[in-house]
Curated annotation (Swiss-Prot):
The modification Phosphoserine is found at residues 12, 24, 27, 45, 48, 323. GO terms for molecular function: protein phosphatase regulator activity. Regulatory subunit of protein phosphatase 1. It holds the Pfam family LRR_4. LRR repeats lie at residues 78-99, 100-121, 122-143, 144-165, 166-187, 188-209, 210-231, 232-253, 254-275, 276-297, 298-319. Interacts with PPP1CA, PPP1CB and PPP1CC/PPP1G. Belongs to the SDS22 family. It comes from Mus musculus (Mouse). Residues 17-34, 48-58 have a biased composition (Basic and acidic residues). Residues 1-64 are annotated as: Disordered. This is Protein phosphatase 1 regulatory subunit 7. Widely expressed with high level in testis. Expression increases during puberty. Expressed in spermatids and probably also in spermatozoa. The modification N-acetylalanine is found at residue 2. It is found in: Nucleus.
Length: 361
């Protein structure tokens, strides 16, 4: 989630440009969720496959692809990892022969309904990312399921998963969900990704005491609230919402990464108990002053670009963070100073990257 570090590479150059790798909006690490190509156990004729075009990049109006009949797909009955990504499958059927399957990937197909999975009692991971599903249903029998991804579909409600009590990771990114609900039984949940939906309030998550990562970016949330029970939370992302104040984080004593960029925050506050923070992203807000963070001595990354910072003396607030390596301060008024980079280096000698450029000493 942090900008990639390249210290020691190309040392003959005075400095080198690197891409800022922004924390996911809210997909988390999609590559990490993909099932490896080595697990592909199905074969399909070339005529039935679509050549290398990502369906997510297509015109959304084009939904006229002909669905493939699953009877044309040869399945390995003994496979534990089945990857049927981009097979143009229109209906889930014929999978009951997979008596040993633990991971089933049905990404980027034409599936409209979750069905005919009740025989897959051994299933641990189910990936339905990028289909045309409008309702979560028919999953009650999959009581051993640990990972469920129904991102990039057409869901309006969170439902039909209250029996999945072994679930550890739930991805419902980029749907049309407007309320967090019906997940109170998921006590084992460690990661919840609800980014790019229509959620207006943080609610109904107080029973998720094992939650470690919560992604709520790109929603319509106006207040940080109802987080007190999540004492194991280490990553919280509420970027690109409608927040005006940093609050409600006092119980998150184990929080290490906090992403609040692209909101309407005016003051840095409310972080008194978050001493373990290593990453703080408050970019693209309305903040005029760095304050109330001198106690965050474990900070490694501080992103405050695109704000209203004017005073160089504010950087003194970061001097206690001896491990601080990366700062983003570009597009603040103080960047107009011709000695901008030099002054940042002098104020924060531990820093190895200023904005998108590495520093070489």
């Amino acid at each position: 989630m942090a900008a990639e570090r390249g210290a020691g590479q190309q040392q003959s150059q005075e400095m080198m440009e690197v891409d800022r790798r922004v924390e996911s909006e809210e997909s988390g690490d999609e590559e990490g969720k993909k099932h490896g190509g080595g697990g592909i156990v199905a074969n399909l004729s070339e005529q039935s496959l679509k050549d290398g075009v990502d369906r997510g990049a297509e015109d959304p109006e084009e939904e006229h692809e002909l669905a493939v009949d699953m009877e044309t797909i040869n399945l390995d009955r003994d496979a534990e990892d089945v990857d049927l990504t981009h097979y143009r499958i229109g209906k889930i059927e014929g999978l009951e022969v997979l008596k040993k399957v633990k991971s089933l990937c049905l990404r980027q197909n034409l599936i409209k309904c979750i069905e005919n999975l009740e025989e897959l009692q051994s299933l641990r991971e189910l990936d339905l990312y990028d289909n045309q599903i409008k309702k979560i249903e028919n999953l009650e029998a999959l009581t051993e399921l640990e990972v469920l991804d129904i991102s990039f579909n057409m869901l309006r409600n969170i439902e039909g998963i209250d029996k999945l009590t072994q679930l550890k990771k739930l991805f419902l990114v980029n749907n049309k969900i407007n309320k967090i609900e019906n997940i109170s039984n998921l006590h084992q949940l460690q990661m919840l990704e609800l980014g790019s939906n229509r959620i207006r309030a943080i609610e109904n998550i107080d029973t998720l005491t094992n939650l470690e990562s919560l992604f709520l970016g790109k929603n319509k949330i106006t207040k940080l609230q109802n987080l007190d029970a999540l004492t194991n939370l280490t990553v919280l992302s509420v970027q690109s919402n409608r927040l005006a104040k940093i609050e409600g984080l006092q119980s998150l004593v184990n929080l290490r990464e906090l992403y609040l960029s692209n909101n309407g925050i005016e003051v840095i506050e409310g972080l008194e108990n978050n001493n373990k923070l290593t990453m703080l992203d408050i970019a693209s807000n309305r903040i005029k002053k760095i304050e109330n963070i001198s106690h965050l001595t474990e900070l490694q990354e501080f992103w405050m670009n695109d704000n209203l910072l004017e005073s160089w003396s504010d950087l003194d607030e970061l001097k206690g963070a001896r491990s601080l390596e990366t700062v983003y301060l570009e597009r603040n008024p103080l960047q107009k100073d011709p000695q901008y980079r030099r002054k940042v280096m002098l104020a924060l000698p531990s820093v190895r990257q200023i904005d998108a450029t590495y520093v070489r000493f």
